[in-house]
């Protein structure tokens, strides 16, 4: 049995080897323990040659980077350092040290590492950098075991570790880092992440102040350090107490920068951290302040599920603020969320967690991770369902704003969301049910808006619809929708199929419902007393329009066919007049009227928005009310529309109600529904009984003649309803209602909410006597002070927009001219170069001065690249200067600028300590030759003699003597007394640029510093992709000169306006002694002079001038 004998021997050898290894490991651990227990004062450093132990000293820990290369291959390491290195190699994969056979030894080693090394100041101060790094690595490995994390706390090591991390971080962020600085920070951030992963231990971290250092490391330049800080902060932010402390620091600005500019992994971790922090109100406010909404919405184009999930939950939290909710809609966030819900995108994801990423980062394996792993279909489905639930949550919060809710419906959102309520038996039941709850909640919020309710009546069967209604308006609790989901899932297959068909019926992207004339009917928008309104599109066009269908059999048009035909004729005639005459921003445009099948169709402008009546109902259900500013904004626009109709067009609307007043974006008012409008002659009265009785004036109810003041009465009713959310005259008994209207009896507006001007205006408009009731001009005069404030804001906004448009126009023109000039210059250079060569060759063969020209020709031939490239640089500067100063481009002006620039360059060269080099001489010489070649040879030779007479040293060469003689014959004598020292303009520009860059390289501040942020944004605009060297020179030059010209606003954000307001009580600049910028100035932005002032203030605060004077 030779094989069995061989196997037995092999087994014995293996057992002996394992036994030997265990014994050796035990011996190594004991030796390390003994070394660590040696007091720092008795420790001997160094002891062994590093090269001899290099084979045993690892490269398996990639985190140990050779920050400084070994000096000539010789470097001595202490015995302890070698043992620590061996320890990190042998136990790099061990995680449960407390269950290891040598647990006691490990615990003693850990205790010694903390007591005798980490918290021993004497040892820390004298230990080599690589030695302390190895101590940190061993601590990191041991602290994978939770038992050792508690021991570290008991020994008081957390505070010392936090202090050391702060010291290293300050050196690192101050660009004075020592060896292994990055590796130390990576290991320490890992340790704090492990501590923060346990809920009860997070308080230890914040008590040590480590969270402040972690926040400052968000400005780190190395990815591993940044990721370590993000991972540790994300673990800390799981606790509400820690979140509160982190939110007190300047964290949002750096997080938004990472989300905007960094790699996918950094963005993913940052989004997760920001999601956790957004539970704090001040974090949400900072996201708004630092204009984070566009950055967050730009990330919705990503295909990574985890990144998208985190970003959407950030949006859910920040859109609780009404202004942020509106901003999300303006930036197209609603469309993007609905696009994600449609499910026609291919997503990717991965299985990594905070813990696994932290371990990979500390071990140097972070770059090897795949952030787009091939997940199973089940995992992808699970992540996608979570993402869809997040989208529904975001749309729910956005739907609290009526305009947002209307856009969701307009973008086919009800159909997209309703599809998610259908059961999906292939997915995880718990997750599918949760998604159904989120979808039902979004639909219920949309249903709360009255105009959307007819849509939902078509969706659900009666029993399910009753449960849907009983939940109530705007109920956020997701648990309230579980019974509704259970009831839906218990329906029979046929009933579910019917619901699915109902959902398909509300799809706005299906084929048109029908065609009326040349118009395709796309959707039913609403119904009124005289007909319906549809959204339509012309067969041959793309523009959306509104079409009102009026049923001519309505009794209001007459009792018999003859009366109806007469009424229709008059209405069509009046509408034709209106169509041709009305051009006002607050009055709807009419395009066409036609008859078809006993129905009158009126084609008009489609107003995006909701009727004022729906806003009343929505605010009442939310228990909110109009602010007085918003109330006046709407009423003033209504007055402007009525003044235009009454006084300029002599048109009485006759049916002015909240449902005929559309509110668009930013509460823009549009008066609609002129189907009952009547154009009257001067001083004539109308007698027909039309309109809505709730808003009808007394003279209409008494069948007396009436005029334009009937609309004033209706306007007063609408103003009253804006203040109380209820009409002034309301009763179920028609006789009682008519009596109240005739006598003008209504409940007074509650006191304390609005000013007396509101109640006075209502009282005057609701005067029962038509003769005593004011017309619309008199009403406007009553609120003249309010209208003047409104007009002032409009004028300010218009002026700011006009100036911004003018700056954009000039900048576009400047860039266009520069691009064309550069193209022309390039072609001109090539043409002149060939012409010069030809002229020189011709002159050298025919002129008596051949020797001199030969020397020049051979000199330029020595460096062909230099002779071509450098003049182009000078020419570029000349072109840029012309473009930026917006001079004309005539030849004389160009030569004048060229002489001026040449004088500056020559002055600079004379002021230098050494003589000008030949490239400068050749550059200016070549420019002169090109510039004067078009003006004549005489001028060319004069300029050449002038250059030579300045004493510029020629390039050494065989023809040098000829050129020197020529130079000497054309010299210029200048008295020494008249020579003055000049200031180098380039040096002044560099000094200013140095100041800007110095400020942006200061260590990040823990608290908000708006001045530094403004300077940082200014620096980014200087070096952005849209900038160029010419623009950089011009901007810095204006800054150094303190130009009063405003800086282009492409880099300023709302935080700068906060800075302006915070400084309103102080002097801003020498030219602004009041120091109180108006709102107009804030809109205009900052001048170079003001930016210079801010820069100098920050330099003073940072001690810049103290350092420079000592230097």
UniProtKB/Swiss-Prot annotation:
Residues in a coiled coil are 481-514
Name of the top EC class for this enzyme: transferase
Q: Which GO terms describe its biological process?
A: mucociliary clearance
State what protein this is by name.
Answer: Serine/threonine-protein kinase Nek10
> MF terms per GO, please?
ATP binding; metal ion binding; protein serine kinase activity; protein serine/threonine kinase activity
Q: Which Gene3D superfamilies does the entry link to?
A: Leucine-rich Repeat Variant (1.25.10.10), Phosphorylase Kinase, domain 1 (3.30.200.20), Transferase(Phosphotransferase) domain 1 (1.10.510.10)
Q: Per UniProt, where does ATP bind?
A: 525-533, 548
Which residue intervals are annotated with compositional bias (Polar residues) in the record? Answer: 47-63
**Catalytic activities:** L-seryl-[protein] + ATP = O-phospho-L-seryl-[protein] + ADP + H(+); L-threonyl-[protein] + ATP = O-phospho-L-threonyl-[protein] + ADP + H(+)
**Where is the segment annotated Disordered?**
1-24, 47-72
EC number(s) reported in the record: 2.7.11.1
Task: Give the UniProt tissue specificity note.
Answer: Expressed in the mammary gland, lung, spleen, and kidney.
Q: Which GO terms describe its cellular component?
A: extracellular region
Catalytic site residues?
Answer: 655 (proton acceptor)
Pfam families to which the protein is assigned, alphabetical: Pkinase
Give the matching SUPFAM superfamilies: ARM repeat (SSF48371), Protein kinase-like (PK-like) (SSF56112)
């Amino acid at each position: 049995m030779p094989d069995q004998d061989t196997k037995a021997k092999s087994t014995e050898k293996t057992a002996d080897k394992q036994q030997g290894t265990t014994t050796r490991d035990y011996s190594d651990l004991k030796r390390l323990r003994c070394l660590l227990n040696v007091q720092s004062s008795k420790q001997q450093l160094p002891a062994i040659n590093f090269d001899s132990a290099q084979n045993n000293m690892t490269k398996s820990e990639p985190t140990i980077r050779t920050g400084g290369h070994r000096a000539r291959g010789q470097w001595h390491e202490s015995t302890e350092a070698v043992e620590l290195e061996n320890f990190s190699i042998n136990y790099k994969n061990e995680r449960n040290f407390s269950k290891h056979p040598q647990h006691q030894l490990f615990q003693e080693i850990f205790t010694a590492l903390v007591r005798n090394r980490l918290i021993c100041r004497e040892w820390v101060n004298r230990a080599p950098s690589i030695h302390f790094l190895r101590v940190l690595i061993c601590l990191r490995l041991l602290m994978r075991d939770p038992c050792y994390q508690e021991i570290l706390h008991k020994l008081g090591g957390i505070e010392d570790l936090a202090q050391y991390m702060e010291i290293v971080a300050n050196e690192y962020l101050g660009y004075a880092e020592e060896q292994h600085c990055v590796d130390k920070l990576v290991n320490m951030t890992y340790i704090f992440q492990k501590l923060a992963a346990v809920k009860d231990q997070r308080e230890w971290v914040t008590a040590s102040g480590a969270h402040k250092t972690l926040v400052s490391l968000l400005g780190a330049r190395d990815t591993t350090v940044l990721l370590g800080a993000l991972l540790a902060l994300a673990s800390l932010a799981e606790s509400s107490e820690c979140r509160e402390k982190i939110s007190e620091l300047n964290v949002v600005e750096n997080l938004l920068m990472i989300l905007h500019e960094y790699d996918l992994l950094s963005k993913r971790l940052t989004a997760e951290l920001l999601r956790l922090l957004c539970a704090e109100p001040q974090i949400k406010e900072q996201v708004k302040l630092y204009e984070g909404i566009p950055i967050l919405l730009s990330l919705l184009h990503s295909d990574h599920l985890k990144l998208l999930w985190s970003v959407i939950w950030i949006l859910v939290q920040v859109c609780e603020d009404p202004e942020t909710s509106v901003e999300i809609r303006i930036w197209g966030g609603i469309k993007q969320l609905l696009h994600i819900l449609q499910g026609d995108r291919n997503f990717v994801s991965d299985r990594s967690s905070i813990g696994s990423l932290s371990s990979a980062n500390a071990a140097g394996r972070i770059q090897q991770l795949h952030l787009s792993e091939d997940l199973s279909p089940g995992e992808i489905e699970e992540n996608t369902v979570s993402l869809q639930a997040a989208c529904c949550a975001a749309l729910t919060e956005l739907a609290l704003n009526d305009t947002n809710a209307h856009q969701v419906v307009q973008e086919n959102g009800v159909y997209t969301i309703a599809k998610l309520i259908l059961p999906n038996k292939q997915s995880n039941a718990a997750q599918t049910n949760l998604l159904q709850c989120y979808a039902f909640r979004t639909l219920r919020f949309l249903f709360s808006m009255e105009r959307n309710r007819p849509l939902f009546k078509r969706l659900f069967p009666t029993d399910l619809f009753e449960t849907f209604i009983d939940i109530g308006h705007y109920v956020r609790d997701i648990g309230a929708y579980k019974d509704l989901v259970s009831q839906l899932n218990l329906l029979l297959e046929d009933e579910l199929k019917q619901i699915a068909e109902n959902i398909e019926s509300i799809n706005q992207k299906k084929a048109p419902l029908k065609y009326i004339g040349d118009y395709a009917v796309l959707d039913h928008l609403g119904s009124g007393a005289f007909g319906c309104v549809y959204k339509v599109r012309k067969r041959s066009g793309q523009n959306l329009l509104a079409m009102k269908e009026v049923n001519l059999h309505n009794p209001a048009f007459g009792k018999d066919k003859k009366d109806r035909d007469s009424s229709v004729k008059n209405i069509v005639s009046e509408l034709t007049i209106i169509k041709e005459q009305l051009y006002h921003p607050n009055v709807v445009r009419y395009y066409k009227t036609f008859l078809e099948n006993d129905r009158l169709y009126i084609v008009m402008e489609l107003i995006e928005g909701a009727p004022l009546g729906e806003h009343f109902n929505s605010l009442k259900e939310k228990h909110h009310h109009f602010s007085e500013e918003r109330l006046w904004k709407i009423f003033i626009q209504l007055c402007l529309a009525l003044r235009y109709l009454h006084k300029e067009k002599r048109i009485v609307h006759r049916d002015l109600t909240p449902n005929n007043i559309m509110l668009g974006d930013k509460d823009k008012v549009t008066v609609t529904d002129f189907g009952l409008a009547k154009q009257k002659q001067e001083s004539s009265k109308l007698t027909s009984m039309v309109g809505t009785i709730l808003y009808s004036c007394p003279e209409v109810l008494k069948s007396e003649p009436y005029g334009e003041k009937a609309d004033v009465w209706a306007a007063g009713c609408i103003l009253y309803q804006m203040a109380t959310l209820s009409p002034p005259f309301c009763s179920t008994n028609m006789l009682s209602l008519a009596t109240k209207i005739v006598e003008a009896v209504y409940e007074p507006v509650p006191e304390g909410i609005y000013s007396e001007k509101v109640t006075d205006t209502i009282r005057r408009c609701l005067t029962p006597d038509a003769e005593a009731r004011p017309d619309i001009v008199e009403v406007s005069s009553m609120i003249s002070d309010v209208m003047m404030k409104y007009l002032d804001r409009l004028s300010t906004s218009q002026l700011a927009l006009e100036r911004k448009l003018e700056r954009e126009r000039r900048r576009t023109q400047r860039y266009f001219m520069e691009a064309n000039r550069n193209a022309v210059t390039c072609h001109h250079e090539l043409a002149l170069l060939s012409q010069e060569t030809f002229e020189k060759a011709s002159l050298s063969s025919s002129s008596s001065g051949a020797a001199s020209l030969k020397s020049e020709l051979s000199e330029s031939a020595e460096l062909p690249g230099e002779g071509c490239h450098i003049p182009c640089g000078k020419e570029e500067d000349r072109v840029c200067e012309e473009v930026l100063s917006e001079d004309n481009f005539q030849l004389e002006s160009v030569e004048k600028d060229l002489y001026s620039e040449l004088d500056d360059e020559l002055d600079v060269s004379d002021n230098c300590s050494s003589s000008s080099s030949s490239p400068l001489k050749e550059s200016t010489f070549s420019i002169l030759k090109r510039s004067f070649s078009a003006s004549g040879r005489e001028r060319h030779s004069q300029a050449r003699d002038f250059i030579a007479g300045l004493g510029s040293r020629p390039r050494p060469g065989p023809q040098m003597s000829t050129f020197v003689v020529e130079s000497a014959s054309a010299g210029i004598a200048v008295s020494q007394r008249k020579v003055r020292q000049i200031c180098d303009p380039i040096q002044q520009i560099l000094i200013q640029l140095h100041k800007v860059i110095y400020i942006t390289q200061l260590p990040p501040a823990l608290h908000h510093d708006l001045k530094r942020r403004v300077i940082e944004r200014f620096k980014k605009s200087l070096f952005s992709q849209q900038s160029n060297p010419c623009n950089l020179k011009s901007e810095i030059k204006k800054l150094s000169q303190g130009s009063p010209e405003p800086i282009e606003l492409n880099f300023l954000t709302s935080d700068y306006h906060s800075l302006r307001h915070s400084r309103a009580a102080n002097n801003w600049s020498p030219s602004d002694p009041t120091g109180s910028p108006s709102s107009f100035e804030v809109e205009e932005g900052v001048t170079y002079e003001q930016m210079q002032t801010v820069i100098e203030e920050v330099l003073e605060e940072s001690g810049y001038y103290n350092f420079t004077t000592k230097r």
